[in-house]
Amino acid sequence: CISIAKKNKIIVAVTGAIDYVTDGNVTYAIEGGHEMMTKVTATGCALTCLIGAAIAVGENKVLSTASIIGIYGLAGEMACKISQGPGSLRMNLLDNLYNMSSDEIMSNVKIKNA
């Protein structure tokens, strides 16, 4: 990922059990999310839209990308705790994104330099 980001002068984000974001110079590791999120169609598409919005207004585009991935993962974790399956997860994920407080974000989003 780092070599691709450097060579093409882009930000690369790879999601999985631990998510990684890099511009080739700075790399972040983000913990969060839940396996059930992979069962809901369009969660990745929605995340991409949120990343686009964040980098449009954020000065530090790599950190903005990592932050949104962390927030989205946290919303997914919270949603999975109360969801019965993928259908209710979709609804609860959106509700958690809408209702999440800045205190919840600051206390629970796990972003580290990798």
Which role fits each region the language model picked out?
Residues 1-37:
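Conserved phosphate-donor
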Residues 3, 7, 49-54, 67-70, ...:
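Alpha-helical scaffold segments in soluble metabolic enzymes
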Residues 7-9, 25, 43-46, 59-61:
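Short coil/turn connectors at secondary-structure junctions
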Residues 19-33, 58, 81-84, 98-99, ...:
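N-terminal loops that bind phosphate or other acidic moieties
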Residues 34-51, 61, 86:
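Short glycine/threonine-rich catalytic loop with a Thr-x-Gly-x-Asp
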Residues 51-89:
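Conserved post-catalytic alpha-helical subdomain immediately downstream of the catalytic base
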Residues 74-114:
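Charged C-terminal helix
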